[in-house]
Curated annotation (Swiss-Prot):
Location, primary (coarse class): mitochondrion
Keyword Phosphoprotein among record annotations: no
Region (Disordered): 1-45, 68-97
Disulfide bridge partners, by residue number: 102-132, 112-122
Motif (Cx9C motif 1): 102-112
Pfam families documented for this protein: CHCH (PF06747)
GO biological process: maintenance of protein location in nucleus; maintenance of synapse structure; mitochondria-nucleus signaling pathway; mitochondrial nucleoid organization; mitochondrion organization; oxidative phosphorylation; positive regulation of cristae formation; positive regulation of mitochondrial outer membrane permeabilization involved in apoptotic signaling pathway
Organism for this UniProt entry: Homo sapiens (Human)
Protein name, per record: Coiled-coil-helix-coiled-coil-helix domain-containing protein 10, mitochondrial
């Protein structure tokens, strides 16, 4: 006896449905999908600018740390150290003007971090950038 309350004999045998005299109606052609509502997330340009700022900061910190470690392990010499000649990277294509809520702060911080050998001098620009990102909802402060 089956476990359920119905027995197998009480179910009618299913038959395939007879073909309909009318063909099934085709669904109406769909209109263009509605544009998604803005989600409050930063746009592509803002994300690219933030990523570029992070890359530049990481590069600057890496260069400072690398030169500090190299200087510490290379031993002292009586000659003053020669500053490394920095070449500005040549962009393959002209970069569009960065637009975004914190573009000015990003530019100021990047300019400072690329021209100063001591990144502690750029701390004010870093704080201004953090405040701008927080104010515009692009990040949360720790």
């Amino acid at each position: 006896m089956p476990r359920g309350s119905r027995s197998a004999a009480s179910r009618p045998a299913s038959r395939p449905a007879a073909p309909s005299a009318h063909p099934p109606a085709h669904p109406p052609p769909s209109a263009a999908a509605p544009a998604p509502a803005p989600s409050g997330q930063p746009g592509l340009m803002a994300q690219m600018a933030t990523t570029a700022a992070g890359v530049a900061v990481g590069s600057a910190v890496g260069h400072v740390m690398g030169s500090a470690l190299t200087g510490a392990f290379s031993g002292g010499s009586s000659e003053p150290s020669q500053p490394a000649v920095q070449q500005a990277p040549t962009p393959a294509a002209p970069q569009p003007l960065q637009m975004g809520p914190c573009a000015y702060e990003i530019r100021q911080f990047l300019d400072c971090s690329t021209t100063q050998s001591d990144l502690s001098l750029c701390e004010g620009f870093s704080e201004a950038l953090k405040q701008c990102k927080y104010y515009h909802g692009l990040s949360s402060l720790p």
